[in-house]
Amino acid sequence: RDASGRYTVTSAGLAVPRQNGKNVCLEGREFFGMVINGEKILHTAHQVRTAKKSFNRLARMFTDKRHPEVLELVKNIRYTNGEECIELLNGGSIEFSARSRQAARGFDGISLVVYDEAQELTDDQVEAIMATLAASATGTRQLIYTGTPPYPGCPGDVFRRRRTACLDAPGAHDAWHEWSVEG
């Protein structure tokens, strides 16, 4: 963030093959955002089970009895299917949702959107989420796209276009990261 509290990187991408640390990177960013910055985060995935898996991993961090200092930060953890959410006493929160045309409705004050499995992300899904962000009063936002390299016939052109834009002509507020085996 800059001196005024705005994100210096507003669009970031991470493309790595499976089992290469993508979720650990996301969990670190989400944990930091909630605990330190009090951010309201929307974590989206292409399937319910993927969103649920990410929720369960992050929820374990906030319920681990070996870390009472983290337990003390928690206001509420909602485990209801389709309404998974972690809320902190400092106002930070994260909600998990499978993507659809209506998936982002009802989320207020979101400053960070995580598009997990973004190789499956479609223009319609982005449009639905961006409409929610446009109504947000935070004044600042960050979008993070994470996924594996798209396979042939993959429905999500958004991730591919985002990567191309960041590598060919990166904007001042763009970041793109990827790693894989050479060759």
Put a short name on every predicted segment.
Residues 1-183:
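Phosphate/NTP-binding elements of NTP-utilizing enzymes
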